[in-house]
Amino acid sequence: MGFIFSTEKVVYVLLLIFVCLENFGSNAQLLPEDEVQTLRTIFRKLQNQTVNIERTSCSDQNWNFVVESASNSPTSNITCDCTFNASSVCRVTNIQLKSFSLPGIFPPEFGNLTRLREIDLSRNFLNGTIPTTLSQIPLEILSVIGNRLSGPFPPQLGDITTLTDVNLETNLFTGPLPRNLGNLRSLKELLLSANNFTGQIPESLSNLKNLTEFRIDGNSLSGKIPDFIGNWTLLERLDLQGTSMEGPIPPSISNLTNLTELRITDLRGQAAFSFPDLRNLMKMKRLVLRNCLIRGPIPEYIGSMSELKTLDLSSNMLTGVIPDTFRNLDAFNFMFLNNNSLTGPVPQFIINSKENLDLSDNNFTQPPTLSCNQLDVNLISSYPSVTDNSVQWCLREGLPCPEDAKQSSLFINCGGSRLKIGKDTYTDDLNSRGQSTFSSVSERWGYSSSGVWLGKEDAGYLATDRFNLINGSTPEYYKTARLSPQSLKYYGLCLRRGSYKLQLHFAEIMFSNDQTFNSLGRRIFDIYVQGNLLERDFNIAERAGGVGKPFIRQIDGVQVNGSTLEIHLQWTGKGTNVIPTRGVYGPLISAITITPNFKVDTGKPLSNGAVAGIVIAACAVFGLLVLVILRLTGYLGGKEVDENEELRGLDLQTGSFTLKQIKRATNNFDPENKIGEGGFGPVYKGVLADGMTIAVKQLSSKSKQGNREFVTEIGMISALQHPNLVKLYGCCIEGKELLLVYEYLENNSLARALFGTEKQRLHLDWSTRNKICIGIAKGLAYLHEESRLKIVHRDIKATNVLLDLSLNAKISDFGLAKLNDDENTHISTRIAGTIGYMAPEYAMRGYLTDKADVYSFGVVCLEIVSGKSNTNYRPKEEFVYLLDWAYVLQEQGSLLELVDPDLGTSFSKKEAMRMLNIALLCTNPSPTLRPPMSSVVSMLEGKIKVQPPLVKREADPSGSAAMRFKALELLSQDSESQVSTYARNREQDISSSSMDGPWVDSSFSEPGKDVSLQQQEEGRSSSSSRKLLDDLTDVKIE
């Protein structure tokens, strides 16, 4: 019995062990072996060594952890679903591996995890692209923000209809968005910012009616903001910053009643737009419509957005007063209305606010009595008057010096402590404020900072070298910097007038120099100096050749005409804003150096030696002048009979060249070096033995303009010395060769720069156009008023303005210039000029004064702003010239529509309006009402206000002005039909032969033959228009 009992006991124990083992196996919840191998391959390709993959990993959770040591902490979180096969088999459903800086590729083996719903590989260092195998799995969430993934948008993602969240931000993806994205009808979040996507937003995205968040900041998109965004009625956040898209904001945006955050910035367009209708968007918390070409008043209903925390309407064309309803915005923390044209008083509730408000650069008519260093309200340059001394200096336009301007140099250690570098002491700049701040401790300089950090409102405005990038040999000021989320301006104050050398010191110290996600940031911003664009899309690390390396952007010849030098750094929505952390983007600068290009008067008297030197030099110059006069008048050596000898005898303050030199320079007048055909003959490009490039004008033996006229021209030009006139280097007179040697201007003519073929055009930015316009004006002012001889050019047009290597304007072709005597202003026998540029009184009556040049300048000024030719551009059939269209736009209050669309929004609206109004003032039909060129220069430089126009087309009830214009139009048409056939052919010949050089002929009249005479000889069909002109000669336009 004992044995039997023992046997039964053993069997019972064995059965019990078997049941226990079976139960244990069923509760183990193991991963299938094939999934284990897939996961091991994935982790190996990701180069992640922190996780061991076993079949039991879903149970022991050894792969789930967070490192709490830093911001953006490395996070590993892998989730399993163990409900398969009676809860005995597990499948991986979610994989999060964030902030590990994993350096591998995106493994295609992810597509073998058949139950995977989420992949989050944010903030790593992955390269390559997203694998096509993902279309095999029921993926719902994909996030790869902050990597190095590249290539086109993965088209396979459009086939994964289960996707609800896609985040590809801060990578290197390129190309257009695929149309099949519209298949993702379950999509709730589509985040694509900080890539290089191009093209338009596909219309198929109108199907994404479940979207709650769409962000595509900083991509180079094209086309207009699509109207179909109104279909996204569940949308809560829309970000379209810095996309290069065109306005206006579509009316359908009013359908997005669930929006809480709307950010649209830096729109392009040919005209300003009305404020979009947002009256239904009452859930708004953050509203940013910066630099969107919005005009008109701020709507009252904005004050009814009770949850509004941030409002940014800066850099638009807003007018009117700040709505009184804004006093109801109890929730707001930040308001930016700077750089508009707001008027009226600043409301007291604004001044009393304890929040951050930027109202700088406006036109408020009743300035408040505030400190220049007001903590919470920035009102710098918000009052248009410059001279009203009852207003604080910092509130006035241009920040005029409150005392005599005595400063001539400035050194600032931006964001750092006081430093001495060599002989220069850099002042400290340690104010930590920056949301809406103006700070000026010493009234020698100041800064104005504006903006709030995206996603991290408490981020700082001073930067330090957190990654220890700056080595010991680099100047100390590169270890610190000031930065701003939107706009950062530095002002050099109380500077003496004159030319300065400006050095802007940069070093990128907020991104790392290693193979981690901390190195993947891209900081991009624009730089303006004195209101002129200096750098677009400036990237410090790219220009310096890496992070932690210094880069100096030097600008020589910065002109201070008042007493302030302004440096403006502006973020335009491009680059990254989440690397290494949120709040790291926007303009950054390390130091500023300003030194004079002029000798600073120390007040010390001249030494006796210096006085003696000046006296001796003055006597020598006087003696030479007497000899020149005696020689020219024949009292010294007598006048020569031979004309060539007479030319040799001229002392023209120029150099003398031998024919051998000229032949060698031009390769014996090789046709390959011919760059144009002037009124006196061909023009050749040449290179002298010392390497200097010249332009040689050769007097043609066939020219009907004799050597005597050549003498007149060379004598006149040699006496004219001005930076904005083509310079005469010298001449050559040997045998029958009569040659003029001019400076060679590398960038050809203004006409070619503006109207040439795509290959020829220079795509001039706004600051260059403004500089060119001022240069032409200064050159003409010199000819009319400053030179010893009063000279009228008679043929100012874009082809007669040449551009040097630095794109400075120089007036050319004085072959048509005429010495003008006040007693003889009516020239009845010869009209020299170009149709479309000639003043009416000159074209119709032959009446010539310097005001004819003023008229022509006005036309050229319009062309510079618009980028369109006055004679070739016809927006509508009823408008003959660009000028006619400009008059209409002026009456409609839409002059800014004339601005060249190629400029986008990258121009100064204030300067553009100033230039356009000056152009129309210069083209006044009455010559007596046109300003002198010296006044035009002052108006262009902002020294005096632009005079209001005295002639308006609508103020002409009798229609006489329209009749006169019609008569001029008929005459122009007659002239073109009869005269310009020869002229056009000739001009085509010249332009075709002058593409390599700046020299082009400016005259449409046949050499030796007047336009008026040609018309009489070649046809009589103009009689009707002439009779009409005769009937109107006494009509007075008022």
Curated annotation (Swiss-Prot):
It comes from Arabidopsis thaliana. Residues 984-1038 are annotated as: Disordered. Residues 1-28 form the signal peptide. It is a single-pass type I membrane protein. The modification Phosphotyrosine is found at residues 742, 842. It is found in: Membrane. It is an enzyme of class 2 (transferase). LRR repeats lie at residues 113-137, 139-160, 161-184, 185-208, 210-234, 236-256, 259-281, 282-305, 306-328, 330-351, 352-374. The chain crosses the membrane at residues 610-630. SUPFAM superfamilies: L domain-like, Protein kinase-like (PK-like). Glycans are attached at residues 48, 77, 85, 112, 127, 196, 210, 231, 255, 258, 339, 363, 471, 561. Residues 631-1038 are cytoplasmic. It comes from the Eukaryota. This is Probable LRR receptor-like serine/threonine-protein kinase At1g53430.
